Structure formats: C-alpha cells, structure tokens
C-alpha cells in the first residue's frame, strides 16, 4: 500500500500554498489502497459522494453553505467527518465557518486555510500526491539524458554500461543514475526516473572505481530526473546465437510498471562505437515520436520503384 500523511503534505506545501494550520492533528494517513484508484482521486472539491477525500472548500462551496439551514449543513459536515477525511482545506481567502472549526476540533481532523484559489490548490496537491503516491520500481542499469531524451541502458554485468555512460557524458550528455534507477509512474503513460540519494552523482567504472561525475565534468553533466522514453539493451552475442533482424518491421517495446517503452538492442563487439550507435538510436526514436519512420519510408520508396515510379533525384 502506497501512503503518506498530512504532516508531510503540510511541510512540503506550506510555503507554496501559504497554508495555515487552524486545528486538528496532522498524523492522519493519505493512502492508495486499490490499484484502480489514482492518487489524483484522493483530493477534490467538497464532495458528499466521496467524503473520504481530502476536501477543498472554496468561495462557491461556502456561498452554497450560507444559503442552507444550519441543520442541513451540520448533517452534511457530520457525514464527511464520519468518513474520516485526511484533512479539510478552506481556500479563496475565506474564513472557515465556526461550525466547521468546532466539528474538526472535536474529531481531530486537520483544518487548513489558504489564500490561493481552490482550483489552484487542487491542481498543486494532485501533482504532489501523484508523485508521492505513484507506483515505483527500482531497476538495474544506467539512466541518461541523451539529446533531451531519457534513455535507460541495460545489459548483463560486464556489458559496458558504465563505460558507455562515461563516453556519453564526455560527449555532452547527462547522467541521471548509475547502477540503480528508481522509476515512478506519475501519470497513466508517463514514467519518471530518478537516482537514489545514496548514489547521486556517482558512477562506478571497472578499473577506475567510483567517480563523482558532478565534480569531474561539472554541474551540467548531471540531471535530477528524466522522463523514460527509450530502453537500450547492450547484448554480447554468443557463438551460434541468432542475430536480430536487420530490417525490423515493428519497434520492440518493454513494459515498465505497465507502460510500454520503446526498446533497441545494440550488439556489443570489439571495434563497434556503441556511443555513436546509441545516439543514432535516440535520433531515430525522436523522429519516430514525431511520426517519421525511416524503415517505412524505405519500404514505401522500394514499392514505388517496383511499380515503375521514378526514384528520388
């Protein structure tokens, strides 16, 4: 179960949202208990159908409440409080009604106020919870920023992943993480990779030991995070092993946390410049993401020439 708590949310967002703690305890848990629930579902405008959410009350909700009888408002607030929401936030520079302060105080539900608009508060907290409560996985490999694309380099031990990363860094690309990469699914089709705090800025290369990339190459050689767009697998061919297709009709993909990611296999052999090949794979992927497929262009040109049409000049 993925979870955080109100205290951590308050500390992380207190300055950004100018939150003021009015009453209640901060120890209540915010958690994702089912796979079908997204972290963004855990917060929203005042909602009696989903009372267990983190509830946001803006000017519109408070204006509606003022038009209702005290008994009706007391009944609805009791329904919400009985569902034990993590917290209630009053936005739009509004003052929380006395009845709300009393109920939250008695039930130990955290009550906050903020001068920011309710919609802005919801957007900011949804983004925060989506990252904090996202699905996560740690994978072995090297994560790089190559030409602005997040590239995850994989391969068996001794395949040359760290050496390749070092060469790419010397060519102006950036290191995100070496050895262990933490990937988070921050949106239905978006994977974000980061480096564990212990390994940040470091890379281990056989024969050289541990190197601090930020110290050696400067600030621009390291990245804090990147979106994963391509997996490059380094593979040493064994005698008799079948070579991959020289003209693949479809790009291979690899699933990470249920999200398909484009995958390229680069055979490793003496004399091959893997850094140049990886850069070419990245450039090809960028073109494909823009709808340009070089393989399909070649097939279409071949078909036109077979049909008697003139080729390009």
UniProtKB/Swiss-Prot annotation:
Cofactor annotation: Mg(2+)
Substrates-to-products reaction catalysed: [HPr protein]-L-serine + ATP = [HPr protein]-O-phospho-L-serine + ADP + H(+); [HPr protein]-O-phospho-L-serine + phosphate + H(+) = [HPr protein]-L-serine + diphosphate
A GO molecular-function descriptor: ATP binding
Keyword tags: ATP-binding, Kinase, Magnesium, Metal-binding, Multifunctional enzyme, Nucleotide-binding, Serine/threonine-protein kinase, Transferase
Binding of ATP, residues: 155-162
Positions contributing to Mg(2+) binding: 162, 204
Matches recorded under InterPro entries: HPr(Ser)_kin/Pase, Hpr_kin/Pase_C, Hpr_kin/Pase_Hpr_N, P-loop_NTPase, Ser_kin/Pase_Hpr-like_N_sf
GO BP terms: regulation of carbohydrate metabolic process
Region (Important for the catalytic mechanism of both phosphorylation and dephosphorylation): 203-212
Active site, per annotation: 140, 161, 179, 246
One of the Pfam families matching this protein, by short name: Hpr_kinase_N
Chain's role: Catalyzes the ATP- as well as the pyrophosphate-dependent phosphorylation of a specific serine residue in HPr, a phosphocarrier protein of the phosphoenolpyruvate-dependent sugar phosphotransferase system (PTS). HprK/P also catalyzes the pyrophosphate-producing, inorganic phosphate-dependent dephosphorylation (phosphorolysis) of seryl-phosphorylated HPr (P-Ser-HPr).
Misc. comment: Both phosphorylation and phosphorolysis are carried out by the same active site and suggest a common mechanism for both reactions.
Family per similarity comment: Belongs to the HPrK/P family.
Subunit description: Homohexamer.
Protein name listed in UniProt: HPr kinase/phosphorylase
């Amino acid at each position: 179960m993925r979870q955080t708590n109100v205290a951590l949310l308050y500390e992380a967002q207190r300055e950004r949202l100018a939150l003021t703690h009015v009453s209640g305890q901060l120890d209540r848990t915010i958690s994702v208990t089912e796979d079908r629930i997204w972290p963004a579902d855990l917060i929203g405008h005042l909602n009696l159908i989903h009372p267990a959410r983190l509830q946001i009350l803006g000017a519109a909700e408070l204006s509606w409440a003022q038009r209702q009888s005290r008994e009706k408002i007391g009944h609805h607030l009791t329904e919400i409080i009985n569902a034990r929401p993590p917290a209630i936030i009053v936005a739009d520079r509004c003052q929380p009604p006395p009845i709300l302060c009393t109920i939250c105080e008695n039930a130990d539900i955290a009550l906050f106020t903020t001068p920011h608009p309710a919609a802005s508060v919801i957007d900011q907290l949804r983004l925060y919870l989506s990252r904090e409560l996202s699905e996560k996985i740690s994978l072995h490999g090297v994560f790089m920023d190559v030409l602005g694309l997040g590239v995850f380099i994989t391969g068996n031990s001794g395949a040359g992943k760290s050496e390749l990363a070092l060469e790419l860094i010397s060519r102006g690309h950036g290191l995100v993480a070496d050895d262990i990469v933490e990937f988070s699914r921050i949106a239905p089709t978006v994977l974000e990779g980061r480096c564990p705090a212990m390994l940040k800025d470091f890379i281990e290369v056989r024969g050289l030991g541990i190197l601090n990339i930020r110290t050696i190459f400067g600030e621009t050689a390291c990245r804090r995070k990147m979106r994963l767009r391509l997996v490059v697998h380094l593979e040493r061919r064994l005698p008799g092993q079948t070579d991959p297709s020289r003209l693949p009709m479809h790009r291979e993909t690899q699933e990470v946390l249920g999200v398909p990611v484009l995958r390229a296999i680069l055979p490793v052999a003496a004399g091959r410049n893997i850094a140049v090949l990886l850069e070419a794979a990245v450039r090809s992927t960028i073109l494909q993401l823009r709808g340009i497929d070089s393989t399909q262009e070649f097939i279409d040109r071949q078909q036109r020439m077979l049909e008697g049409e003139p080729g390009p000049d």
